[in-house]
Regions:
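Conserved ATP-binding/catalytic motifs of P-loop helicase motor domains
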Residues: 1-220
Length: 220
């Protein structure tokens, strides 16, 4: 049961063989395969999603509840916020000759959004960091006083701080220090958001609802 809990901390859905393999690995051969197979099937809250029949997908009741919560919140809060009236032109201070039109389009969409939750996806090397830097300038010109950046690991935080995101901190630290949360109405940027667990993402969305945060999930 402990192994399954650990697996689903980082995975929303897993195939049966992946679960069984990890249980076997941590069991170190002390229990035969048939006994392990039967024990896993009896774990409370484990849900068989079916298909393919020979190696079905599994999740947990807790994960389903979290996913449903996140989906419901996103749907219920669409269009409830004001957009950011910013007169800053992204990359107007750039000294390079690079074509920033795609990045500017992304920034415009985010700034003009009336949803509390937004997503920014881009492959490695697509210019996400410079886009976020310009986005922050737009947000500040649009009246946003507090912008906070959150990342999954200490190394990612170090990189962000070196790129002038001085307030960057880890997701774990952010969620643990609830007495030191940013003030209401802050703008949160969740970098490499796909590396966070479903539990962390759900907690972040709950905090956003409680504190009127706007949240941008960034990843590839």
């Amino acid at each position: 049961r402990k192994v399954v809990e650990q697996l689903f901390e980082r995975n929303g859905v897993l195939r049966w063989d992946a679960i069984l393999a990890e249980v076997q690995n941590q069991n170190l051969g002390e229990t035969d395969l048939e006994t392990l197979h039967a024990a896993i099937e009896k774990i409370p809250g484990l849900v068989n999603l079916g298909k393919p029949a020979v190696n079905p997908y599994f999740t947990t009741e807790e994960n389903i509840e979290r996913e449903n919560y996140c989906i419901d919140i996103v749907n219920q809060t669409k269009g409830v916020c004001n957009d950011f009236a910013s007169d800053y032109i992204p990359f107007s201070e750039a000294e390079d000759t690079f074509d920033h039109s795609a990045q500017i389009e992304v920034i415009d969409q985010i700034v003009q959004s009336k949803d509390p939750f937004a997503v920014f996806r881009g492959v490695a090397g697509a210019g996400k960091t410079s886009t976020l830097q310009e986005l922050c300038k737009c947000l500040k010109k649009g009246g946003v006083i507090n912008i906070h950046v959150v990342a999954p690991t200490n190394s990612a935080v170090d990189v962000l701080r070196s790129e002038n995101f001085e307030s960057a901190q880890t997701m774990a630290m952010f969620l643990q220090n609830k007495d030191k949360l940013p003030p209401k109405g802050s703008y949160l940027i969740i970098d490499e958001s796909g590396l966070n667990s479903l539990r962390q993402g759900t907690e972040m969305m709950k905090l956003a609802m409680e504190n009127e945060y706007r949240v941008l999930f960034v990843g590839d």
